[in-house]
């Protein structure tokens, strides 16, 4: 969250709400019945953490309201009734989700005006393009959105309910095979950190597995909060491989490369060349080292042989949706 015209968000915190799982015994500690974001993160050892947003759709509106309240009053320190608000959502989200968002903004926070933008479109804005196909992958949902001369092509938008949280869950599971047990909601956050710091995408998965078997070159160690050190090897690339092979976690979906290709194929034959040459990655789950090369390799294999494929992975892509929103909201034409 932040202000239009800024080049980076002022506040970045996880969309989590934590509630104590023990009864408070010390009086006057100012204990709250719920903690949001970073504060929930720092006290996670005694809390049960819940995510109000699942697969890009808000499933718990009371908690979502807490998160917005925290954003306005504690993080940005603004009165929401004095500022128009730009919110974002995943494409193909249920209409009811958007209506409820709007209702809460106007009725609870009394915002003077609001707009709900599609995430992927904002990422393309941020990359300085008007034509391209965006693969946006966050915590709960991934989607591919082809955009031509500023128009999103709704019939060709594809959505994949596979994203960061599923990768974290998968890593929790494969670390169990190594004899490390992570089960609680707080431990899941530790595994998420392991994923973000150590995972990478193999250019050739089968070959990487062979390398991992024979040498210890892929092994890295990670220190847990209690000082215990764990070693992680092939898990580093087995975790995000799920993006390309969803069948690894029992999902019947196409991988991100195939979804991108399918999305391009749903577009008019005349504009495909422009899309192949402008594949833009966005969102935290596209931050894995090696993703652009692998994506390029996989799509080259699917596309016509003479086609020029270009995968763009901007360094700020973790926040490119926000940056695009900042650009959009500061345009004078938009404000009218």
Curated annotation (Swiss-Prot):
Reaction equations catalysed: ATP + H2O = ADP + phosphate + H(+)
Entry EC number(s): 3.6.4.-
Molecular function terms from GO: ATP binding; hydrolase activity
Chief subcellular location: cytoplasm
Gene Ontology CC terms: actin cytoskeleton; cytoplasm
PROSITE patterns for this protein: ACTINS_1, ACTINS_ACT_LIKE
Subcellular location: Cytoplasm, Cytoskeleton
Function summary: Actins are highly conserved proteins that are involved in various types of cell motility and are ubiquitously expressed in all eukaryotic cells. Essential component of cell cytoskeleton; plays an important role in cytoplasmic streaming, cell shape determination, cell division, organelle movement and extension growth.
Note from the entry: There are at least 13 actin genes in potato.
Protein name as it appears in the record: Actin-66
């Amino acid at each position: 969250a932040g202000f239009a015209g800024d080049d980076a968000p002022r506040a970045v915190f996880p969309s989590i709400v934590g509630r104590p799982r023990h009864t408070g015994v010390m009086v006057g500690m100012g204990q709250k019945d719920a903690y949001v974001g970073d504060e929930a993160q720092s006290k996670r050892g005694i809390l049960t953490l819940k995510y109000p947003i699942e697969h890009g759709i808000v499933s718990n509106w009371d908690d979502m309201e807490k998160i917005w309240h925290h954003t306005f009053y504690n993080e940005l320190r603004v009165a929401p009734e004095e500022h128009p608000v730009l919110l974002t959502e995943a494409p193909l989200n249920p209409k009811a989700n958007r209506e409820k968002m709007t209702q809460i903004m106007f009725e609870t926070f009394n915002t003077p005006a609001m707009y709900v933008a599609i995430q992927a479109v904002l990422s393309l804005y941020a990359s300085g393009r008007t034509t391209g196909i965006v693969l946006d992958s966050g915590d709960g949902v991934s989607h591919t959105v082809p955009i031509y001369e500023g128009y999103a092509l709704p019939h060709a938008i594809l959505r994949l309910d596979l994203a960061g949280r599923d990768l974290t869950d998968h890593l929790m599971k494969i670390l169990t095979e190594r004899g490390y047990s992570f089960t609680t909601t707080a431990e899941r956050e530790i595994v998420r950190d392991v994923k973000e710091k150590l995972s990478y995408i193999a250019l050739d998965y089968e070959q990487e597995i062979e390398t991992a078997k024979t040498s210890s070159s892929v092994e890295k160690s990670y220190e847990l909060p209690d000082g215990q050190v764990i070693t992680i090897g092939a898990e580093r690339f087995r975790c995000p491989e799920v993006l390309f092979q969803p069948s690894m976690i029992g999902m019947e979906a196409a991988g991100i490369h195939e979804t991108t290709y399918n999305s391009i194929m749903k577009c008019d034959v005349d504009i495909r060349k422009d899309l192949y040459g402008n594949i833009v990655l966005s969102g935290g789950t596209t931050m894995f080292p090696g993703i652009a090369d692998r994506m390029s390799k996989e799509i080259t294999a699917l596309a016509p042989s003479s086609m020029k494929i270009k995968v763009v992975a901007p360094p700020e892509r973790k926040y490119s949706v926000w940056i695009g929103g900042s650009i959009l909201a500061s345009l004078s034409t938009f404000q009218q």
